[in-house]
Amino acid sequence: MATTADFKNGLVLVIDGQLWTITEFQHVKPGKGPAFVRTKLKNVLSGKVVDKTFNAGVKVDTATVDRRDTTYLYRDGSDFVFMDSQDYEQHPLPEALVGDAARFLLEGMPVQVAFHNGVPLYIELPVTVELEVTHTEPGLQGDRSSAGTKPATLQTGAQINVPLFINTGDKLKVDSRDGSYLGRVNA
């Protein structure tokens, strides 16, 4: 059991028999009325995202989630294979479970896999990943009215928007949560 004061990103709640993870939360203290907590919850199994409001101080059931450090090894058909860093056991995870994170997965990348009762639930990439640009059009100085962006393809096949000065072969820092450009990696 946890109260709303214990809420943090990544906490897994049990609501109506289903597992939900908190992706965003905000404590709100209005001028009139009681305080409450506004949350954005993601269903661990289906990936569905919902907004839910809790009254301050309410007790909520939490799930025991074991996060293990793993390394992404390779893709085998529709499965992604991860190796546990503790016991070197390999865990093939289906594409549906890996989800959007597959866009930024590189072989040898350290990844956390969350388990509940021995069953893998989801993976957590590092917040920032370093990837190389494999293709982008050259940006011309006079082709915009204000600072602009252009599409770039990364070595994993993911496409993101980057500033015009980025060239093919540049190594970039990318936010793995939303795919946004964070900067160039100094070589």
Curated annotation (Swiss-Prot):
The job of this chain, per UniProt, is described as: Involved in peptide bond synthesis. Stimulates efficient translation and peptide-bond synthesis on native or reconstituted 70S ribosomes in vitro. Probably functions indirectly by altering the affinity of the ribosome for aminoacyl-tRNA, thus increasing their reactivity as acceptors for peptidyl transferase.
**What metabolic or biological pathway is this protein involved in?**
Protein biosynthesis; polypeptide chain elongation
Q: Which CDD domains match?
A: S1_EF-P_repeat_1 (cd04470), S1_EF-P_repeat_2 (cd05794)
| Statement: the UniProt record of this protein carries the keyword Ion transport | no
Q: Which GO terms describe its cellular component?
A: cytoplasm
- Gene3D superfamilies cross-referenced by the UniProt entry: 2.30.30.30, Nucleic acid-binding proteins (2.40.50.140)
Q: What is its main location?
A: cytoplasm
Q: Which PROSITE patterns match?
A: EFP
- Compartments it resides in: Cytoplasm
NCBIfam families assigned: efp, PRK00529.1
The chain's coiled-coil residues are: none
Would you say which domain of life the source belongs to? Bacteria
One of the protein's GO biological processes = peptide biosynthetic process
Q: Which family does it belong to?
A: Belongs to the elongation factor P family.
This chain is encoded by the gene named efp
Instruction: List, alphabetically, the InterPro entries matched.
Output: Elong-fact-P_C, NA-bd_OB-fold, Rib_uL2_dom2, Transl_elong_fac_P/YeiP, Transl_elong_KOW-like, Transl_elong_P/YeiP_cen, Transl_elong_P/YeiP_CS, Transl_elongation_fac_P
GO MF terms here are: translation elongation factor activity
Q: Which UniProt keywords apply?
A: Cytoplasm, Elongation factor, Protein biosynthesis
Protein's name in the database? Elongation factor P
**Source organism per UniProt:** Mycobacterium tuberculosis (strain ATCC 25177 / H37Ra)
